[in-house]
Amino acid sequence: MIMKKSYLLAGGVAALLLTACGQEDTATGAAEQKEVLEMGTSAEFAPFESRNPQGDIVGFDIDLANYIADELGVELKITDMKFDGLIGALQNDRVDLVLAGMSATDARKENVDFSTEYNHSGEMFVSQKGSGLETLEDLEGLTVGVQLGTIQEEGAKSIIEEEAIDFELKALDDSGALIQEILSGRIDAAYMDKQVALGYIEAQGLDAFDDPTTASPGMAVAFPKGSDLVDDVNAVLAEMEESGKLDELKDKWLTDEQ
């Protein structure tokens, strides 16, 4: 059973002030807040979230989530699942929030709420060294892999339709599988988040080029529709931006400057 504590709203900004369990709400207007926040992620998206050799989930999003939880005075519990199941987990109240390098697209906003954006990467097409793939036109007639349920899957479909580039699309469960498909020659390229791609490019000696089309939305924290947590998390993100803490996390985890 999850224990409950109360928090006060002060100065128009929600700040969690944990009180003794069972204490009644004050007259200043309080809302119940879980003492344990259940967070969903998909740990196949380094440097945002992945498992280290010890099996622990680490990454930019994990440090960010832990910082947010500390600021709100709550414990964080992380559940690892497939990326394409994260929205459903929010809708079914299995988790309270999701940090998974998730872009705040209009389609997703119909089903969940988002915080303010905390990072924007852009996309890249990754291929084997010496592939000669340098432009969208070079992808004509080839097979391009994407991670299932991601904005890159949506973006690749848009490129096929809007840029009139005819390539076959192959959706896989995670970014690691995409790289294995490239190395084995089963796909010609993978369309990936730029920050994720840069790590694989360095590790595997791969080639890549930037997607020149319209930039995708930035990454944000996702919540169930109507969640009271949105304002609280936005307040923490604003403080992190102001204090430079967000830049510190980017310097620690992200290869490119943001």
Where in this protein do the model-derived segments appear?
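Acidic, polar ligand-binding/catalytic clefts
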Residues: E75-D138, A208-T213
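Periplasmic-binding protein-like
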Residues: A43, H120-S127, K194, L198, ...
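Flexible hinge/capping segments at coil-to-helix
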Residues: T28-A30, S127-V144, D231
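Ligand-binding clefts/hinges and TM-proximal coupling segments of bilobed small-molecule sensing domains
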Residues: Q23-A27, I151-K170, L206-D211, A238-Q258
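C-terminal motif of bacterial Sec signal peptides marking the signal peptidase cleavage site
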Residues: L17-A20
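A ligand-binding cleft/hinge motif common to bilobed small-molecule-binding domains
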Residues: M102-E110, G155-I159, L183-S184, D188-A215
